[in-house]
Amino acid sequence: MSNARDVIKRPVITERSTEVMGDKKYTFEVDVRANKTQIKDAIEEIFDVKVAKVNTMNYKGKPKRFGRYTGFTARRKKAIVTLTPDSKELDFFEGV
């Protein structure tokens, strides 16, 4: 993952994630192969902020059936990024 935009897939906008935005915590869906250091570097490069810590969660795919064929949905990884107190707010989430 040479590019920072390959690490960060999309923001996660849920009721809980919007509540913790006041504490400078932002939630993103990230590549499943990315580690915390790569996620931190990608956020700092894209948004030009300082990251205090990164918490990650791995989700397994859910079993799904289509007729007699069974399979799984894609697995995913979610990261909650906490910014330092002196960092600016991410304007990406304004109006949410």
Swiss-Prot record:
**What keywords would UniProt list here?**
Ribonucleoprotein, Ribosomal protein, RNA-binding, rRNA-binding
What GO annotations for molecular function exist for this entry? rRNA binding; structural constituent of ribosome
User: Which SUPFAM superfamilies does UniProt cross-reference here?
Assistant: Ribosomal proteins S24e, L23 and L15e
A Pfam family found in this protein is Ribosomal_L23
Task: Give the highest taxon in the source lineage.
Answer: Bacteria
Q: Does the keyword rRNA-binding apply?
A: yes
Give Gene Ontology CC terms.
Answer: ribonucleoprotein complex; ribosome
Biological process according to GO:
translation
Tell me, in a sentence or two, what this protein's role is. Answer: One of the early assembly proteins it binds 23S rRNA. One of the proteins that surrounds the polypeptide exit tunnel on the outside of the ribosome. Forms the main docking site for trigger factor binding to the ribosome.
- Please give the subunit comment from the record: Part of the 50S ribosomal subunit. Contacts protein L29, and trigger factor when it is bound to the ribosome.
- What family does the Swiss-Prot or TrEMBL record give for this protein? Belongs to the universal ribosomal protein uL23 family.
Name of this chain's protein? Large ribosomal subunit protein uL23
Q: Top-down, what is the taxonomic lineage of the species of origin?
A: Bacteria, Bacillati, Bacillota, Bacilli, Bacillales
